[in-house]
Amino acid sequence: MTTIRGNIPSPNNANVVLTNVPCDSTVYVGAAVRMTLVGVAVNALADSAENANVLGIVEFKATSTLCNIRVLGVTEKIFTGLDVTKTLFLSPTVPGGLATVPPTSVGQVMVPLGQPFSATEMLVFKRDSVIRG
């Protein structure tokens, strides 16, 4: 068994990354994305159930309209300043954004997306969403 950082098992066996996915030009590395009906990744937003249906986190953009999306596992070192004591949620105000505080307004959707693994990496997992009512 391969380990990283002491005795923590390597997460390589639990990695799911979708490669060369068509994406909107506004999508950026580190963004939480959802898929449109025509199969294009767009920035997700916790303002409605439809917009908050997150597929994963963009890890790489080969072109302005082609990206790799992490669905499960530890991301590449694409972030800065993550706090390992905080759960990350989908932002209700910044398209594709991550927040350390869950949305609380009526109609917004609480979507837990993952846990920082280090200051630069995130363990991506998607839990059930909760629509605030």
Predicted regions and their residues:
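Glycine-anchored, exposed beta-strand/edge motif detector
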Residues: T2-G133
